[in-house]
Amino acid sequence: MQSTSSRTKMKTINADSLTPILIFRRLQGNRKFLLESSAQHEGAGRFSFIGANPRKTYKGFGDEIQEYSYKTGNTYTHKGDLFVLLKRLMPRISNTTQFPFSGGAVGYVGHDATTILSTAQDKVQLPDVHFHVYETVIVFDHVTDEVTLIHTNIDAEKKEPNLEELAEQLLKGREDEDTTCSYEPFESITNEQFATSLTSSKATLDEDMTRVVLSKRFLANLQGDAFALYRQLRKKHPAPYMYYVEFEDHVVLGTSPESLIRVQGERVIATPTEGTYPRGSTKGQDLEHERKLYENTNIRKSHAVLVSAVRQELQSVCFRDSIQVIEAMRIERSKHALHMTSRVEGQILPMLHALDVLAATLPPFASIGIPKDQAKDYLEKSSQTSGIFGGALGFIGFNGHLDFALTGKSIVIENETMHMQSTVTVTKYTNVKEVLKQVEKDEQEFLQLLEKEGGQH
């Protein structure tokens, strides 16, 4: 047993017979989470994080946060700006672990978290922000093949858990039985309705608002287990960010190719992604497709606009002269696609919290449009905001580190209904008929990813 501080205890075990999925299935408890990264993605993350049985939860609606303690059963209501409240409520405990996340909050922030009064009506009635706070976290190191159990006491006097027993549970425990799932899709909005939205949005574009992102929700009935659905999705569509998080009355799962923002100490890291191209079937085709993606003038222009917007956005939370494009228009590979991405870094301003950085980057450009303020106003006035799908999911560590991924391709499961969405960026050059065909194709391809031996019943 190691101690990194008076409040933090650790135990390391050999992981050569374990996987993050197996650990999750053996871990006993409620409101479990799994955050992982695909080894099939070049430059994938080194660590996976697993946890269960949070100490408390924060649930935000409009201008108030409900804080619920699982220890006492008490609920406390706090009024004010959601991010100001979160900064005040989130525990901050320093430690010297080498891991980016060793305990803290896991959850999501939706589109409306930065808007106290919104006229938009989201079809999934979920909180604007929702976080569970975990004192005990399991870290899987894919490089050293080790698993580290970490417990951080929020209250110094609280009794510590037995990490030896937890290690025994993970190494020899009985995992949950294999489960299956199937689904039956149904339409939530017709193509005619979406075409009307596209046409109306296109007509409003001008020099002040050059692009706006619209979303089309589609639904399916789920029969079976949500975690089986996640396992199928991660197998068919691995990505740098893969997540499965259980809440009281819903589950959020998905695989995302794109980070929204990271904060590591004083460093703020954004990786804007714009431009995709299918993978080739051979190494030679991959290189040829990379060349086509890189040499596409329209994609490069659009990518440059996004990078410029991200740099400008970071000026509100970073020293201006510290903001630099470290990597420009780099091509990254996922299992199915090539992505053009850049890396922008800056140094956070003193006295600011990582949550200030997160607030400054929401809603993401990828889910709203450019310029952000004008696109946001338009979507809210026309009741077309995308709720959780227009936000981000990730962790906020006790140590102040933060890492969030975009949630546009998430699946939200509530009352056996799967909520999903397609998005399209509308410009003055958008061909409505072509967009409708592409959206329908995207929906079919996404549902096909979830099929297993026929999958759909």
Task: Go through each PLM region and give its residues.
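Extended alpha-helical targeting/anchoring segments
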Residues: 1-457
